[in-house]
Each structure stands twice: as C-alpha cells, then as structure tokens.
Regions:
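Glycine/small-residue-rich hydrophobic helix-like segments
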Residues: 182-248
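Short amphipathic alpha-helix that is part of the acyltransferase structural core
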Residues: 1-42, 153-181
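Conserved donor-binding loop and adjoining core beta-sheet/short helix segment
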Residues: 28-31, 35-99, 103-105, 117, ...
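Conserved beta-strand-loop-alpha-helix junction that forms the acyl-donor binding cleft
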Residues: 114-125, 230, 258-269, 285-291
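Acyl-donor-binding surface of acyltransferase catalytic domains
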Residues: 1-5, 74, 86-155, 286-288
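Conserved acetyl-CoA-binding loop-helix of GNAT-fold acetyltransferases
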Residues: 90-103, 130, 228, 234-251, ...
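A short, internal acetyl-CoA/4′-phosphopantetheine-binding micro-motif in the GNAT/acyltransferase core
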Residues: 81-90, 226-234, 262
Length: 291
C-alpha cells in the first residue's frame, strides 16, 4: 500500500543496499553516542552469503532503530553483535531481536550464544547482566601504529599463502589447543570460500608449525587465527610470521592493520606491542546457554 512504512522486526538472509546503508548510519550514531567502536564491518554485511538468516532488523515507522547480527561457522556457538538507537532504548527492542535470533539459532542446533559487549558500553553491560549471561573472556583490539620490525630469519622456516590443499595442515595447528578437529575443519573450510579471507601457513623443515588468517575488510585488514604450535612458542617464529604478514598487507593496501588478543595472554600482548601495535579498545564476551 502506498505510503506505508516498514514496522517491527524483519529477518533477512541478504541485505539490500538501502538496508546496509541504514545499518551503517545506526552504527555511526550508536558509536558517537557512547564513544564506542562497534564491532561490525558493513562491507562484510553487504556481501552476506544469503544462505542463512543472520540479520535481524527492527523498524519504527520505516526508520531502522535496532539491529542484531549473528555469526558462527562450523560451531555450536553463535556470536551476536547488536545495537538500538539511543532514542528508542528501554522499549524491549533488543530483547525482541535477541529472542527471535535465539529461536533461529536453536533451529540450527546451536547450544550457546556469545554476546559481544564493548567494555565501556554501560547500556550493553546492563543488558547482559539483566539476561543472566556469564562472562567468558575479554579481548583487546590492537591497531598497528609505527611498525617496528626486526627482520630476523630462521633457517628452515617458510611462510606462504595457503590454499585448500593445506586444509588439513591448518586444522592440525588450530585444533592443537581445542582438540575439536571436526568443528575447526568446518570453520576453516568455510573461510577458504570467503573472498575476503586469506590463510597463511608456516612450516619448519616442511612440517606445519603455525598459521594465521588475513581478513580484508572495507576499512582495515584483520589478522586472525594466529597460532604457533606448543613447543615452538617464544622462539621468534611467531614474530617472523607476524612481520611477514604485515609486510604482505602493506605491499597490497594502506588500510589500517588490526588484531585481537585475549586480555590475559601477556606473552602475545608483549609481542604485539613490540611490533608497534597499540590497544584501541576492549571487548567482553558473555555466554548464554540456549540448548
């Protein structure tokens, strides 16, 4: 009917350009209102797979006032990031978004939701506490300032871009700590299909020693899944991997380079600081069992 406006909650598998633009505006508004750095890349949202319902939008008289994004590949956990327009809070909008997303995740046999809350977001913290969610861990987001490289080269260590034939080698590295080979395998296989994602494999005397993943986003490049096998840590291999990744990124783009690190991983934080990374903000992750 002419003149009608979208109202209430809308579930989407693929976003239109107008929807993505509205989400971007909402992110900017919420960030400004609380002085935050919302953990959502609109460039990624614009190119969603379209195979699953991961976007939940809430409208008031045609205006987007709430948004929730669900992410999770190959795992029983689903990571949720969302926001509500400052003028429309305390009206149950985010709870409605979360309830609907929870139902969709349960249909996919998810067992747990992980809610991402920036450490300094008073509204987010109040909400997760009201839900009864429990704190799982926290991460610093670190951004590269002035790159301080050493260019140490270790004999026998080779670092190269990986392809799908390296899937088993990468999984063997990433599953060292968790032991969940099947879940990691699904997750890595999915990431190999993503055009913005690129894995690198490090081998020592032709044996898999470590890996990392580059994620090329709209305004920055993230370094993720950075792992060195136990027994080879603290020997300089990780630093060489990180330096080569930074040089590869810098040769291709001038975008900002960032990475995440758990706040209690003091050794990794020390490495990143020594390479020129600086802490930008901190995110807290809260678990909510739904199975």
């Amino acid at each position: 009917m002419p003149g009608t406006h979208t109202q209430g909650l809308v579930k989407k598998q693929t976003l239109t350009e107008a929807e993505a633009n509205a989400i971007e505006q909402l992110i900017t508004l919420c960030n400004y209102y609380e002085g935050l750095h919302m953990r959502l890349d609109v460039g990624v949202l614009r190119h969603g797979s379209g195979n699953e319902t991961n976007d939940f939008l809430y409208y008031e008289d045609g205006i987007l006032v709430g948004y929730l994004f669900v992410e999770g590949w190959g795992s029983r956990d689903r990571e949720l990031t969302g926001m509500v327009h400052p003028d429309f809070r305390r009206r149950g909008i985010f709870r409605s978004l979360l309830t609907t997303a929870k139902e969709v995740c349960q249909q996919r046999n998810a067992q747990k939701l992980i809610l991402v809350c920036e450490h300094f977001s008073q509204s987010g913290l109040a909400f997760v506490n009201a839900l009864g969610a429990y704190h799982e861990y926290s991460e610093h987001e670190m951004v590269l300032g002035t790159f301080r490289e050493r260019r140490n080269v270790y004999k026998g260590l080779h670092i190269r871009q990986a392809n799908s034939s390296d899937l088993d080698a990468i999984v063997s590295v990433l599953a060292t700590d968790s032991g969940n080979v099947e879940s990691v395998n699904r997750w890595v296989a999915k990431l190999f299909e993503e055009p913005t994602s690129r894995f690198y494999l490090a081998t020592l005397d032709q044996k898999p020693l470590g890996c990392l993943r580059l994620d090329f986003m709209s305004d920055q490049v993230g370094i993720y899944a950075f792992e060195v096998r136990l027994g080879y840590r603290g020997l300089g291999y990780g630093r060489q991997m990180l330096e080569e990744a930074i040089r590869a990124i810098s040769a291709e783009t001038q975008k900002r380079i960032m990475l995440d690190v758990e706040t209690d991983n003091t050794n990794a934080i020390g490495l990143y600081l020594s390479c020129g990374f600086e802490i930008k903000t901190t995110y807290d992750y809260y678990g909510l069992i739904i199975s």
